[in-house]
Structure formats: structure tokens, C-alpha cells
Amino acid sequence: MNKVYKVIWNASIGAWVATSEIAKSKTKTKSKTLNLSAAVLSGVICFAPNAFAGTNTEGGIGQGTSISGTTSCREGSANTANQKDIAIGCGAQTQDRTGSNIANRNNPYNNSTGAYAGAMKQGGAISVGTGAVVEKGLGTAIGSYATTQGISGVAIGTGALSSGNTALAVGRQSAATADFSQAIGNVAAATGKGSLAIGHSATAEGYRSIAIGSPDIENADPVAGQAGAAYQPKMATKATGKDSIAFGGGAVATEENALAIGAFSESKGKKSVAIGTGAKAQKDNAVVIGDQAEASFEGGVAIGKGARSEAENSIALGKDSKASQATGESFLTKQSAPTGVLSIGDIGTERRIQNVADGAADSDAATVRQLKAARTHYVSINDNGQPGGNFENDGATGRNAIAVGVNASAAGREAMAIGGNAQAIGSGAIAMGSSSQTVGRGDVAIGRNASTQGAEGVNSNQSVAIGDQTKAIGDQSVAIGADVIAKGNSSVAIGGDDVDKIARDTELSNTYTEITGGTLQAGKYPTTEANHGSTAVGVQAVGTGAFSSAFGMTSKATGDASSAFGVMSNASGKGAAAFGAVAQATGDGASAMGINSLASGTNSTAIGSGNKPGEGANATGNSSAAIGSGAQATGDNSAAIGKGAEATNENAAAVGGGAKATGKNAAAIGGGAIADQENAVAVGQGAQSLVEGGVALGARSKVEAKNSVALGQDAVATEATGTSFLTNRDASQSNGVISVGSAGKERRITNVEDGSADSDAVTVRQLKNVDSRVNQNTSNIGKNTQNITNLNQKLDDTKTNLGNQIADTNKNLNDAKKDLGNQITDTNTKLNTTKDQLTTQINDTNTELNNTIGNTKTELNTKIDNTKTELENKGLNFAGNSGADVHRKLGDKLNIVGGAAASTPAAKTSGENVITRTTQDGIQIELLKDSKFDSVTTGNTTLNTNGLTIKEGPSITKQGINAGSKQISNVADGINAKDAVNVDQLTKVKDNLNGRITDTNNQLNDAKKDLGNQIADTNKNLNDAKKDLGNQITDTNTKLNNTKDQLTTQINDTKTELNNTIGNTKTELNSKIDSTKTELENKGLNFAGNSGADVHRKLGEKLNIIGGAAASTPAAKTSGENVITRTTKDGIQIELLKDSKFDSVTTGNTTLNTNGLTIKEGPSITKDGINASGKQITNVADGVNAKDAVNKGQLDNLAAKQNATDDAAVKYDDAKTKDKVTLKGKDGTVLDNVKAGHISSTSKEAVNGSQIHNISNSIKNSIGGNTVVNPDGSLTTNNIGGTGKNNINDAISEVKNTATKAKTTVTEGDNIVVKETVNKDGSTNYEVSTKKDLTLNSVTTGDTVLNNNGLTIKDGPSITKDGVNAGGKKITDVANGVIAQNSKDAVNGAQVHHISNSIKNSIGGNTVVNPDGSLTTNNIGGTGKNNINDAIKSVDEKVTNGVNDLTQKGLNFGANDQKTTQGKAVHRKLGDTINIVGGADAKTAEDKTSGENIITRTTEDGVKIEMLKDVKFDSVNVGGHVLNQQGLIIKGGPSITVNGINAGGKQITNVADGINAKDAVNKGQLDKQINEVKDQIGKDIGKLSDHAVQYDKDKNGNVDKSSVTLGGGEKGTNLKNVADGKVAEGSKDAVNGGQLWNVQNQVDKNSNDIKNIQNNIDNISNGKAGLVQQQKPNGEITVGRDTGGTSINMAGKEGDRVVQGVKDGEIKAGSNQAVNGGQIHKISESIKNSIGGNTTIDPKDGSITTNNIGGTGKNNINDAIGTLNQSNQELGNKITNLGDQLQQVFYDTNKRIDDVEKKANAGIAAAMALENAPFVAGKYTYAVGAAYHGGENAVGVTLRKTSDNGRWSITGGVAAASQGEPSVRVGISGVIN
């Protein structure tokens, strides 16, 4: 009979109890409240096939609810141990462990053969079933022997085990052993935390793992007769990895994040995925999808049935696809095999990939459409059916190389070979054409058999060979044409070898012969050829001379630097130039211009054409000039100007058509003029000077007499004959005559001055005067005769008178004769004067004409090629750091020199320290910062391979350090045996032995003062000399300027006259020459350094050759004597003398100058001595002589006896200051028997361990709780106030945090706004709304998506971060964008059209703008060309035809060795590069070099490179000796660095007596000390122990520095005046009472703060001072050995002494040992840790500072606790309020429980109303029921359908109760066997 139970309220115990409605009224002795018992019972009823089929309630026992049978329970009645427990069923217990055996299903996770009911740990548990056990509170165990061991765990099913917290195990012998795990199914196991296992034998072992599925159940072992019930490990579903998932029968996921879905799928790699029946992902990150698909390598992907990925990172896509390991290089690109592949099939089952978009990136897949578009048309390679090399596209073996063609090979990096048998071997080389070959770097060979390969072992670089059979075999050579050879470095050959067609063309051949006189020969093929630096352009052109140029067919330039322009032109002389067809320039420096011109003389010039060979200008004489057709200048220095002009003798000049000057120094000027004798001059048309020295001036004038002059047209000067009139002088044949006319054509000489000398010409005026006097005399004679006749009679009378008259008359006649003679003489004199004047004028005219001729010659030679004149003069300007710019004409030599002698052999110089860099301004010369020299001299200081030597000063060499009788000052105390010692150390020895060293006077300042005066006088003299020299220079400059002005005036006048004379010629030549001027100016020269880009300078521009020193550096600061330059093949190499001299050398902090060696903040060695700068002088050999330095070993030996007795003494660290005592124990030293020191704020006395212990103990008592005093005096605090915290700060913070919790906050999330308001009832209202401005990841509206990347419209435009994509649409209505350099605006079509139109207008002509904006141009500028490039090229070709030999002339560069036989000038063409290099590696980094030591100055000869006398280097290496920032290191010898002086095991000799404390001492001083103290040793030393504090001795009598026992007896000894020791962890310093007082004072304060308890610590009684003596002021302290407590006063003069090396003393009650700062710090640290928070320790005195303890804002414990109390009070108020609120919650909860009770009763009634329908095979059956329970009622209807064979049935039902919602039930039942 079914029993009915109900739940009633037991008012006596205040609990609900379950009781039978029909049993006797028998209550349990005790019961426990179960608030939700109704729900639990209804759940239990639902599990039963028949509701409440059971027994009465008499069988249960215990304090809770126990329900079981009373008589048939073999296992015993149900039993509960707690009031809240429920045990239902026989043997169900919540206390004792009793049980029985169950059938074992071999679950390895739950294989117990016995189930026991265990004692309940806490209440609230449910166990239902025989042997069901719940071991933790709130657990549930339902089923026979079900066990729950974790809190809130659930175990449902026979033998189910739930051992993890909140774990769930459902199913027979299922196990959920980990926290939060779930196991559902027969023998299912969930052992991983948070794992889930569902299904037979399903196992989830990993953290958060999931296993769903069953194994091979049919083959599982039977259990108790049940087939397949045992745990089946085979094909079991398993998830063993962290976060792994196995879903499906036999699925396995063994690694972290592995996923296996499908029957027997396997995922055995980390983060691997296997989906599909039998799918296997064996390695990490593998992905497998498909039946039997498999990926066996890491990262593999297999998708599709049977797909296999058998290589790492490979993908197999599609049914039976296979992805294997990739091998071999990639086709075409030759990339190595990748690490993975993508396979969409297998061999024989390949697949096609369809609907592939065109690829864009290099690694994108390409489509057939792209291949069709990329297919190259009209390209094919025919191997005639015979595959050759490169058939497999493997001919390109170099990196990034290209090989196209049969047998083509490209072995060089980035090389290209195109054509059959083409070979590109060099890096970057190009070979195009059959059998073409390039072997050098950057070579280009284009054409059949074109090659850049020279003889064996000779290969070119960057050469170009273009044409059939063409070869370019020199570096940077160019060969273009058929059978052309450019065999020289930097050569250019353009042309060919075949003139057959021209030779066979009669007309052309005849033309060639007419012009050249030669014959073209068919069948002969001389090749176009160019040598080093040469250029040959034209068929059969030859440029074999170095730096030569040959332009034109069959032209030849065979001389070095020669130039030949024109067909068959020839320039065979060095520097020769031939311009024009058949022009011949065969002499060195010769110039021939014009057809058939010839210049064969050295430096000769021939300008003029002739129709036939020999008819052109001919200059065969050296320095001769022939200008004009047929002009002949055959004499040296001769000049023939004009058609057919001849100058055949030395210095002869013929100017004018047909003019002939055949005599030496003769001049013929004018058409047909002849001067055929030496010094003859003929000026004028047809003028002839046919005698030596004759001058014919005037048209057709003629001189036939030697030294005669014919002046005037048609004048004839013949030989003089006869005697002179009156004077009867014979004519002079040697002096010649002057003729101003000829017979019948005499000329009047007018405007003649009256003659005065006998040889002067007389004038008509003078003759008239003579004639007048003669007439007067004749008249007188006539009168006298008449008188005689008329007066005969008077004859006798008058005879005497007459005689007198006759005598007078005779006298008068004689006088008249004499006067007439004088007049004639005067006339002759005047005539002679006139002759001289005429001669002078003729000579002046001759000179003027000669000047005109010479100037015309010079001007024409210059103007023939204006570039050769103007540009030669323009040249280049060179500038240095200082000095005027230096100008060099083209061809001039620029000397780039240093100050060293040019004869200096190369072995004495080196360029390894020099490097040049090209800069924007020119060439910068720099020195390596780490330079190497054989020798460096700075004034009197020399640094070489032997070491450092200062003249008349100290030296440091391999042999040792010689102080040069100078002091070694500022020497640090020696430490090691070989260290130098200073006077201070020696003085200390002497003081210890009561001796004194007599001081000596230092006279260095006087010497320095005298030297300064001398330098000042020298400077004054130098300044005076400089001033005088400046005045002289000024005067010289003034004179030079005056001379310059005069010369300028003369030159200008001459130039004006010359321009007037040959202006027409100049005008004609200017237009031609100007066209090439600009080009040649721009060509200039290139300059290169060791590194940097080449620097280009136009002609006339300035090239700066500078150093890094300031340009303003005065010359006195620099010198070029260390610099030398040498010319090399590449240019100018700048070198430094290996033995260099400087005023100063600076390397970092180290300076070497004439005074010596100085290291900043380090030692120095100068003339004044050695200053060690507070550093040690180490490795000093033992001193021997009196002036040798002594080392510390010698000093130690001297003090050995004292040390023997003094070793046990405790000493001050510094005997003078007495502020510190360091005890020498290895692990510290224990000071025993230390009397308790006074503890106060001012105490300096040492304290002992017992005092520390007392303080620590007082702190312990103040803190209380678990505080412990450790043996070292520190404190340990644990769980202060039960807070779980170990320091006061954290404890207070913990209490504060607890008080401030229980706070509810509402915060705003993304796009959310929270508004807080207060309701009328005082409660808080939170209004939540969205923000007006939202922040979202993405917004999608239809086809439009707006996200972080931008705006995208499907199949339309997009605006994203990558830009605007119009999507194939037009962008219309675009406003005009800004067109500027930095504009990013879009532009529209109108703007583009406007631009195109403006370009059209700029080009002009026939330019047309097309509709699409493009431009069409035709016949630009009338050139016939249709594009600007070709048009400019066409114009440029016309300009370049005028380029001449000035390109070759360039500049010459000289160096120091140019002045010797060792070097020669370096020549560079215009546009070429001149390398100005040093010997350092060009790859030297810029931070390794510096130009700051170099300066360049321009001089008259060029640019002079100088170095600063005071130079700076990072390092100087001299023969292995290094001078750098650290100092000087001598290889194998001493060193002096910032760390001190290391003598290198050598003696320091010749050391002056040390004076100051830090001066070095010599052995003489040491010996003197020894002698002075020899008698004193032993007198007082033995008594030292009576006065000194000493270390203890060990059992062997040796000094034990780990212990010092003070001799104060039992009471100890006070250590007074102890300086504050360091209070820190690990400190071994002694601490004094003052420090402890500070600590104690702080502790007192903290103690008061903690519990407001005032602990007064009495002053510790201290004993009186014992026997402590200080022998004299600032002397040693000795502690007496008297018994009783004594103290050591360490106050000292300033009260700042410290006792160091104090070993840890004992800290305990009764301890009187001294403690050190480390112990005090440890105690303070423990106090700090106990207080916690922001507590800090002052390292000076160990005091403790606390801030904001526990976050209370208070700085002491008392206030913090007060704050805490207030918080606790506030917390109490909050708790009280919380209790009131909880009362209301309980009231509401009870009310809800009442409602639950009603609904539970209604639920029970509903369950009871669902009556089981009958079980009839093949039929539908039903049942209707009604029930009443606990005041609630229900009705129910059940429907059953049973199968025809009766083996299963399905049931469904519905019930409606008086409370709650309707209940629905569905179930299925069947028969297993």
C-alpha cells in the first residue's frame, strides 16, 4: 500500500517537518529546518516511476530528516547527523562511513568497489539512495552509493562520484572530480577543472575541456551481466588538453585548444581542428575538415574527403587532394622552395581553379586573362631543334640576373645576357647579341661578338661595347660601331673599319681624293681605335695617344693629349691639335687649322686652308705661326700671315698676301712686301728691303743700300757715292742713306727744325740767312772796285788803306766763310737730327708694326679658339681655409703641397692617417681621430717608438721613467709592492718612527715667471717684426699696384690698337668661338676624395680645399711641415710625416705639447716634473740610486718591524682627522665587553647588544600580538589584530577596506549615460540612456557600411583610410583644386585642359591640344624634330661640333715631390676627376676622422695644406705606443693614464726630492729616513700595546681581525665620541647612543600611538669614563687595560668620527657587546616592516618616519588607531542599519517561502494526479487522476502508447493544480533484454 506524506510546521522547534498522513503520530527526536523541502521532495517524486511507493517513516533516525523502511533495510535505516540534513533510503547516511560493495565498471577515475555514506561536513546536503554519501555542505547525492565530496556538488546515478566543488556527475559510476566539472553518462569522467564529459566512457581531462560521445560500446566488457557496461578506453571520446573539444564517438582532442568533431576524429596538436569522420589533425595549428582527411605537419590544412596535408604549413583542398613538401627553386624567379604549398588535387587528379580575380600583388595568383594580356608578341627563339644551354631557364645564375637566348648565361649579380651564347659575367653587366660577352662590373656589350674582355687577366669595368665585333677592354671605355676597339682605360671609340662602299663610289672617292690627296682603299679594314683616356670618333679613326681625341673618318690622334678633327686629320705631336680635313699637327704642342694645313714645328700654329696638299698654311718652324692659305712659316719663332705669305728664317715675320720675310729677324708687311736680308724691314704694298738692315717704308719703296732707309711710296734708297758738298767728306757705305723719294720723284721734307750739330740737317731758313750775308759782301766788293778805278791817282796814297781794307775784307770773307761753314754744319746737324728723328719714327713705326704683327699673331692665336684663350685664363680658382683664392689657368700646374721637404723619402711619410671627403664646397681633408705616427714632436716633447721624451725634462720610455731631476707630484698613495709612494706616505713612516723630512723650496714659479717674461719679450719682438714686415708689404703692394696700373694702361692701349687693326678677324671668329665657351666653362673639372660624391667645378669657379680647422686660425697656429703631397696616377695623395712635429697634440682628455704630457683630471709629465694627479704610479721597479723613485714595497719593508708589533693595533683610518675607525675582520669584528653607552639625542657613545635587546623587547610589547624579537634584535610581526597582515600599516588598511566595502556603484558603459537622482523616499534612482554622440565599431544600413575604416557602398564608391575609390563611377561637379607644390586637392578636366593649353603655348609652333588633353608637336623650332628632346639634341649637335682641344688641356696638378725626380705633374681634362686622397681606407667612417687639425692656405704656387701646431686626436699611435684620451701607453714600457702611472716594471729614475704630501719620494729620501730612524726602532714600539686598542689573537698567536676585546674588565669599556654609523642593511658600522636614542625616541612615539600607552624608558646608566688617552692633540687614541667598564670617546674635534668594521654583537638581555649600524638598521627595518605602509628609515641615525598609516592620513599609530576606532564606530552604525534591512529581507523572504510552500504542495498534488496509464501492447491507454496535498489540489490526465511487440511504450500527461502553472510530463520506457 502506498504511503502518503505531508509537510507540516512544527511550532515547538520552529521548522517544517515531513510526516505520514496515515502513520501513527510519532515525531522525530530532533529535526532540522529545510526551507525548500517541498521542491526537493517533488523532484524526488518525479524521478520515481511510481510516486511515493515506500514504507512508513519509522525506520529513519538522526537529527535531520531521515526516511527509510523500518524492517526491510539490510544496510540499516537512513541516518542524519545534522538538523539540516536529509537522508532518504536504506543505508542513506550523513555521518558514519558504512557501505557495501557495488559492481565495478572499471572507470579509471571512479573504480572504487565500495561505497560508503560519510559524515556531513556542514548542513544543507541532500543524499537519496542506498549508500548515497554527501561529504561537503550543500551537496546532492542521488542514487545507490552516489558520492558527493565537493561543496555544492551533485552526483546522480549508481556509484556516481562528484568530488570537485560544484561538480556534476550524472550516470552510473560517472565521475566529476575537478571543480566545476560535469560528467554525464555511463562511466563518463570529467577530471579537468570546468570540464564537460557527456556519453559512455566520455573523458574530459583538460582545463575547460569538452568530450561528447561514446566509444565502441559493442566491444566493451560486460559488468554484472550487463553487456558493454564497463569503461571502454578503445575509441573512447577524450578531451585531454586545455580548452580542448572532442565531439563524436571515439573523437580525441589531446592538446591545448584542440577541436575534434566527428566519429573517431583526432586533434592532437595545439590549436588544431579536426572535423569529419576519421579526420586527423596531428600537429599544432593544423586544420582538417572532411571524412578521413589528415594533416600530419604543423600548420597543415586538409579540407575534403581523404585530403592529406603532408608538409609544414601546407594546404590540401578538395577530395583526395595531397599537399607534399615543396622542393626545388621556383620557375623563372629562382626563389628557394617555400615552407608550405596549396594543393587542390593530386598527381593525375589535378583540378582547375575557376572564377579567380586578376592578381595585383606579386604573390597574388594570376589568371588566364592576365597571361593573355601579358603575352609578348613578335618574340621568338629558334634553337633549330637542338636544345642548348639555358633551355631550362637556368642561365641566370647571378642574383637578380636575366639570361635570354640559347646558351645565354648571366653569372653576375643583376647581370643581363640576351642572345645566343651571350655571356654577362660581371656584376650589373649587360651582354646583348650573338656571342656577346661582358666580364667586368657594369660592362655593356651589344652586338655580335661585342666584348669587354681583354687579354688574360685584364678585364674592364663599367665599359660599353656596341656594334659587330666591337671591343671595349679598358675601364670605363666606350666602343661604338663595327670592329671598333676602345682598349684604353676611360677611352671612347665610335666608328667602324669599312669604307668599301665609299671607295667604290667614283664620285665620292674622287671628292675624297681631291680634298685629301689620298685614296680610299676597299678591302682594307683598319679599325677605329682609342687608347687610355682617348676618344676616337669616325670610321677608321685612331686615337692611340693617351688622352687624345680623333674626330672624323681616317682621323688620327697618335700623340699624347693630341686632338684631330676632320677627315684624314692627323695630330701626332704631344698635345698637338689638328682641325680640318687633312690638317696635320705633327709637332709637340702644334696647332693646325684648315684643310691641308700643316704644323710640324714644336708649339707651331698653322691656320689656313688649301685646295691641295701643301697649299694650306704650313708652320714647320718651332714656335712658328702661319695664318692664311698657303702661308709658310718655316723659321723658328717666325710668323707668316696672309695668303702665300712666307717667313722662312728665324724670327722672321711676313704679313700680307705674298709677303716674304726670308732674312733672319726680317719683317715684310704688306701685299708682296719682301724683306730678304737679316734685320731687313719692308712695310707697304710691294715694298722691298733687299739689303741687310734696310728699311723700306711705303708702297713700292725699295732699299738697295745696306742699313739704308727708303721712306715713302716709290722711294728708293741706293748706295751713296761721291764726296759731300763743301765738307768734301766721302760717302759711308756702311751707314747707308735715307731716301724719301726717287729720281724725278723727290720729296720735300717739311717742318724740319733748325739744325745745330754738325750732322744736323739745315733748314731753308738757315740757308736764306747765309745767302743774305753773301749778297752783302758782293755789294761791298763792287763799290771798292769803282773807287779804285776812279782814283788811280790816289792809288799809291791809298795803297796802304786799300791793303788794310783788303785785309779786312779777306778777314770778313774768312768770317763769312766760317759763318757759312757753321751754318752748313748746323744745317747738316739739323739734317742728321731730322734723319735720327726719321729713323726713330721709322723704328717706332717698325716697333709699332712689329707689336701690331705680334699682337695680331697673339690675338689671332688666342681668338682662333676663344676657349683656348679666355678659358685657359679663366681656369679654376682654389680656396683654402684662409688666404686669397689661387687662380690657375688651364694647363697650369697647381701645387698642392705640405710644409715638409719635397725630397722627404716615401718611407718617412704615410697617408694612412689622412682621408679626403668631397663636400658641397670642395675637397675636405681630414685626419683619422685615431692616428698612427712613427714619431710626434710638439716643441720640446717627442713621442716615438721608444716612448715619450721631453727635452730637459722627464721621459717615459721602454727603459723606464726618467724624471729628469724633476718632481713627481700629486702621486696617489701606493698600495701594491711595485707602486710608487709619495712624500705623505714617507712622512707617515717618519712620523710613526718620530722622524722628520726636511722640506725643500720649489723654484718652479720663478722659472715659470722668467720663461713668461722671455716669451713676452719674444712676442713683442715678433709683433714689431710683423709690423715692419706689414709696412714693407704695404709699400710693395703700393708699388705693385702702380706698376699694375701702368701695365694695365699700356695693355689697354695696345689692346685697343690691336682690336682696331684686326677687328674684322676678331669679329668673324667671335661668333664661332662663343658658341663653345659656355659648354667648356660648364665642363670644368671633377674632384674626388677618399669618400663622398665627386665635386664639379666650372671654369672660373672656386674649389675649396679645406681642413676642419677654423678659417680664422692664424698662421702662427698652423704649420705644413708635417704634410707632404705626392702625385699619383689617380691624382694628389696627401701624406703626413711619420715623424711629425706639433706644438700640441690633443687626444680626448690627453694633451701633448712642448711643455710635456697632460691628462685632464689625470697624471701629467711636464718640464716641471711628473704630477700623478692623485693617481697611483704602479709597477715601479725598486729604486737603486739616490734619485730613483721608490715603490711601496720598499716603503713596506722599511715599516715591517713596526707593522709586526703594530699589526694588532686598532687605528683610526685617518690619523689627522680621526673621524673613522674601520675594523679589519673579514666578516666584521666583534667588540666585546662594551659597556652600556649613554642613549640620548646627543650621545656619541657605543651601545651594546643588551641595550638593543631591551629596546626591541619594549617595541615588541608595544605592538603586542604575535610579535617576536629575533636573535639579531629585529622584530617579526604576524597576523596583527587577526587581520592576516604582518605589518601595522597593512593591518590598519585591511580594517579600513573592510569598513569601506558594501558600496554599490553604477558606471557608464560605452555610449551609455547614467544620470543619478534622489527619489522622494530618499532612495537613489539611476536613469540609463544612450549618448547623443555614439562611438560604434560599425554601422550597416542596407548595402552601406560605416566603420573604422571608412564608408563602403557595395558595388559603388568607397571612402576609406586607403583613399577614395570611385568604384568605376565618374566624380562629377569637382571644384577647382589648388595647384601648388604641396597641394593634395583633386583637379577637374577643365584644369587639366588649361594646363595642356599652357604647355602648348609654351612649346609654340605647331603644337596641338588633343581632346584627351594630350599634346601633339611637329617640326619644333624648324628643326624637323617632333619632340623637344630631339629638337634640343639637334641644336646641341650643332653646338658640340665646335668642341676643341681645350677639353684635353684641362689642368695640371703638382705636389711636393713634383719638385724632385720622384713625381710628375698630374694632368686632368676638363670634366675629369682629380682624386685628392689620403692613405686611410676610403670606407673609414666619418666619426673616425676629423678635419679639425687641417687648414689649407692659398699661396702663389697653389694650395698649401697645413696642420694645426696644436692638434687634437682621439688616438695617436707611434710605433705601437698609443696616446689617447686615457693617456699614454708605451708598448712594453711604462704608461701614464687617467688611472695613474704604471712604470711597467721599469725604474723611475732621476726623481727630484718630494716636498708635498702627494709628491713622489726617491730612494735617497728613503735611505735618509732609514738612517735617521735606525737607532729609534724598538724603543717605544714594544710599549705600543699598553696604549693601543688591538685586535684579538687566535690560538696560534696570530692577529684575528674578526674580534677586538676592550680591556675594561667585567664592566666593559666605553667607546666615546663614536661617529654616527651607517644604519642600513648589511652595514658593519658601529652606532652610538645618540643614534639609538633617536630610534628609541621614535619607538616611544610609535608605542604611544599604537595603544596610547606611555612607556617611559629610563636613561640607561652608563659608567664613568675609563682610561682613554690621546697622546697629543689629533694624536693616536689608546684604551687602557684597567679592569672595569671603560668607554671610548670618539667625539674628536668635530664630533664626526665613525667606528667601522664592528662585528655583530649579541642582542639579548645582559649583552654588553657593541652593535653596528647594520644591526640597528635591521631592527629599524623590522619595525618599519611591522608598521608597514610608507614607513621609512633615515640611514644617518636609523630613525623611523611614518606617513599615512593604513591609508588613514595619520602619521603615527595612535592617531591611526583613533581614526580606525571612528571607522569601526561608523561601520557598527552601518551594520546596525544593515541588520534592520536584513530583517526586512527575511520578512520578505519568509513571505516568498510561504508562496513557494503553496506552490510546492500544488506541485506534489499535480504529480500525484498523474496516474499511470495501463501497459497494453499495441494499444493507446489512458488514465485520469485527482489529488489533494497540503491544502492544495490537482487533476491530471495521462496517455500511453505501447509498441506492438510490447518492448517499449511512450507516455505523456498533463496536470493542473490550484497554484502555479500546469505541469506536463513525457517519458519513454522499454525492455532491455
Swiss-Prot record:
UniProt keyword annotations, A-Z: Cell adhesion, Cell outer membrane, Coiled coil, Membrane, Protein transport, Signal, Transmembrane, Transmembrane beta strand, Transport, Virulence
Positions of the UniProt region annotated as Disordered: 606-630
Compositional bias annotation for Polar residues: 619-630
Biotechnology: applications noted: Might be a good vaccine candidate. The ability of Ata to engender anti-adhesive, bactericidal, opsonophagocytic, and protective antibodies validates its potential use as an antigenic target against multidrug-resistant A.baumannii infections.
Surface exposed passenger domain: annotated span: 54-1772
Pfam families: ESPR, YadA_anchor, YadA_head, YadA_stalk
Inducers of expression: Expression is growth phase dependent. Expressed at high levels during early logarithmic phase, and expression declines throughout the logarithmic and stationary phases.
Disruption phenotype: Deletion decreases biofilm formation and decreases the virulence in the murine model of lethal infection.
Region (Translocator domain): 1773-1873
InterPro entries per UniProt: Adhesin_Head_dom (IPR008640), Coiled_stalk_dom (IPR008635), ESPR (IPR024973), Pilin-like (IPR045584), Serralysin-like_metalloprot_C (IPR011049), YadA_C (IPR005594)
Comment block on domains: The signal peptide, cleaved at the inner membrane, guides the autotransporter protein to the periplasmic space. Then, insertion of the C-terminal translocator domain in the outer membrane forms a hydrophilic pore for the translocation of the passenger domain to the bacterial cell surface.
Protein name: Adhesin Ata autotransporter
Protein species of origin: Acinetobacter baumannii (strain ATCC 17978 / DSM 105126 / CIP 53.77 / LMG 1025 / NCDC KC755 / 5377)
